[in-house]
């Protein structure tokens, strides 16, 4: 069964714990000695963007939008990769990168609808859903570093069926709240 990730942006508080946990888990530098101009903080497999504040319905709104690889079933980055450095793990469906094969052409960046690919020192970095934590190739449930570190419990990793069920439940909750708000 393929694995997936979903971030409930209504719960994300923008604390950046996911970024710190991911960098520690993957031994990525927080700040390189000689930072390149375009990426002074080193590679980030997950980024968090602040959206807002803005006024809607006479209220101030702001939310945070984590950006990371969502491991698309038909990942366009795999098709676009000219050197076949991006591939799917057959058992888990996780999109992975062979950095030794990556030539840094950035063709994957052009086609990713999420802006997930990160380049640092000429190599591609993508979230790998902490595949090394999944136990025996996805059969044993363990938390990813970002999921375990999130104090708001906004990050969810599971099988595609589990994630679809969570997203469906969230959509139903939102629809109920909107219906209630309109009825007032």
Predicted regions span which residues?
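Non-ligating segments of multi-cofactor redox enzymes
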Residues: 1-184
């Amino acid at each position: 069964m393929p694995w997936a990730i979903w971030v409930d942006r209504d719960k994300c508080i923008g604390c950046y714990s996911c970024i710190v946990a991911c960098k520690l888990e993957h031994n990525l530098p927080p700040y390189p000695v000689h930072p390149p101009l375009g990426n002074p903080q080193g590679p980030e497999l997950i980024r968090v963007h602040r959206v807002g504040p803005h006024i809607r319905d006479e209220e101030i709104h702001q939310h945070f939008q984590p950006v990371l690889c969502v491991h698309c079933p038909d990942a366009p980055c795999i098709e676009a990769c000219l050197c076949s450095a991006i591939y799917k793990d057959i058992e888990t469906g996780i999109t992975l990168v062979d950095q030794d094969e990556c030539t840094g052409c950035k063709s994957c960046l052009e086609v990713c609808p999420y802006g997930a690919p990160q380049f640092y020192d000429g190599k591609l970095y993508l979230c790998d859903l902490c595949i090394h934590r999944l136990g025996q190739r996805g059969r044993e449930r363990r938390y990813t570093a970002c999921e375990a570190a999130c104090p708001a419990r906004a990050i969810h990793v599971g099988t595609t069926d589990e994630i679809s069920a969570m997203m469906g439940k969230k959509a139903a909750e939102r629809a109920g709240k909107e219906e209630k708000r309109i009825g007032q």
